[in-house]
Amino acid sequence: MSIKYSSKINKIRTFALSLIFIGVIVMYLGLFFRTSPVIMTLFMLFGMLFLVASGIVYFWIGTLSTRAVQVVCPSCGKVTKMLGRVDLCMFCREPLTLDRELEGKEFDEKYNKKRKS
């Protein structure tokens, strides 16, 4: 069974989207406690915290995306953004690297870890 990889930007965007859904579900669960205003308010506040956290993550990935290196994918020919030493094309999932040492090697996300000096 092979590992399913995704580009880093898409992973972070998916995480932010999941925070939105979690926040809405938590707030919806709060409606079941309408008889207890304190518990309902706590659920609504926790749900709102998830939504605010999602907004912060979206803002962060937006600023990170503006600084990402844009490259043309050799496989599909579309412009994609790279974060780190290795990443995948957002469109066709072709492994990409800007590091000459890693060209031709099997794709592994561990290449993005900080090197020990």
Swiss-Prot record:
It is found in: Cell membrane. It comes from the Bacteria. The keyword Transmembrane helix applies. One of its GO terms (cellular component) is plasma membrane. Keywords: Cell membrane, Membrane, Transmembrane, Transmembrane helix. It is a multi-pass membrane protein. This is UPF0295 protein GK0479. It comes from Geobacillus kaustophilus (strain HTA426).
